[in-house]
Amino acid sequence: MEDSAAPRPAPRTTNHYPLLELLYPQSQPQSQPQQNQQEQEEQLRPPKRCAPPRRQRVRRPSASVSSSDSSIPGPTLRERSERGKWSVTTSGASVTLTAQTPGGATVTLTLCL
């Protein structure tokens, strides 16, 4: 005998839709028994939840900051690269830094923005 052959009970049906009552409190079905005032108020009140923390956007300087920007203290990257040990090149949305180590090896770092 297989369990799947046994008749399954009919699914439970209900005429009580609490979410609809929250949306449309005046359209409660008349067939429900009257509840006391406190229970009705609890059903109509939305559940108390803490709001998630709001993210604040952090303003970041754009990649195209000019060398004359007075907010950058000291020499800029391009000014430092004039010493010949490393260079910075930009192309579209990428920035490439090429540097020479004291041992003579060349290191290249490319950032795709």
From Swiss-Prot:
Lineage: Viruses, Monodnaviria, Shotokuvirae, Cossaviricota, Papovaviricetes
Subcellular location: Host cytoplasm; Host nucleus
Organism: Human papillomavirus type 2a
Processing and modification events after translation: Phosphorylated by host ERK. The phosphorylation triggers a structural change that enhances keratin binding and protein stability.
Protein name: Protein E4
Keywords, ordered alphabetically: Early protein, Host cytoplasm, Host G2/M cell cycle arrest by virus, Host nucleus, Host-virus interaction, Modulation of host cell cycle by virus, Phosphoprotein
GO CC, alphabetical: host cell cytoplasm; host cell nucleus
Subunit structure of this chain's protein: Assembles into oligomeric complexes. Interacts with host CDK1. Interacts with host SRPK1; this interaction may favor expression of late viral transcripts. Interacts with host cytokeratin components KRT8 and KRT18.
Family: Belongs to the papillomaviridae E4 protein family.
InterPro entries associated with the record: Papilloma_E4
Segments of this protein annotated with the region Disordered: 24-89
Pfam families: Pap_E4
